[in-house]
Amino acid sequence: MFNFKKTSIFQHKEEIEVPQYSFEDFPRESHVLAVWGSPGCGKTVTATKLAQYLASRKKDVAIIYCDMMTPMLHCVCPPSELEELHSLGSILSAAHPSPPLIKANVVCHRRNSHLVMLGLKKSENLYSYPAFDEQIAEEFIDNVRELAPYVILDCSSYIAFDILSAVSLMKADTVLRMVSCDLKGVSYLASQLPLLNGEQWNSDKHIRIAGNLQKYQAVDNLAQAMGGLSYQIPHAEEVEQQFLSGNLYKDLTAKQSRVFQKMIIQIAEEVFDV
């Protein structure tokens, strides 16, 4: 395990000599990716698998599960594989979400030293902590950017009510706009995209993705409705089973998952240049 920055959240548990890497070994600046889209399109699965892929490449990555209605930490990873659980709410309810406060509240993965997570704990909700505003959300994302070279924000679908997810779309360097291949997905975007009018959203630069794509679904019609698709992430039975069992950080081994994994790798290469 190593540190990209002196203020990195990835710290050694005991004092050992840290190898000196050349400047070219790591990104010149942190890159923040927001993953957003319609309900059921595979946002959390995609965000988690991207984080897992980066960590498997020994890239230090922080993933933030922004959903304030459905805490996701216990839905993506067995509690036994996580070190001491902390809550994102403890950070956002502070007067200032400072780097030391963030570092003290990250959740570490026992099996992967290049991965940390943030999110609400099981049974918590938006009202479990004092309310926070846009300024706090912006300061939080800025400080996470200073601590980790790769940051993934798993946004909720309900950006009109979720301040952190909405601010994530504004502050991210790249946004994956995902949609399920059905009328509900198309209707969702038709309803929500007008909220993203304005230069601060950069919605014209979103990477458009069809997620959780079933073989029988008419992706051509969806592509036309969305103005084109950059990626088509297929449904994978193995991924679904991992999601149902709350173990999305488990490696994919089934032959049928190869196309899914290929899409994850291609997205990681485009977004993070790894």
PLM features: residue spans?
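Conserved lysine of the Walker
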Residues: K43
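Phosphate-binding loop that captures ATP/GTP phosphates
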Residues: R57-L115
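Inter-motif core of Ras-like GTPase G domains
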Residues: E146, D162-D182
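Cytosolic-facing regulatory segments adjacent to core modules
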Residues: P99-N112, V116-I159
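NTP-binding/hydrolysis catalytic cores, primarily Walker-type P-loop NTPases
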Residues: S245-V274
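Extreme N-terminal, non-catalytic leader segments
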Residues: M1-S38
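Hydrophobic positions on the alpha1 helix immediately C-terminal to the Walker A/P-loop
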Residues: T46, L50
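Beta-strand-loop-alpha "switch" segments that mediate conformational coupling across diverse proteins
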Residues: A210-A254
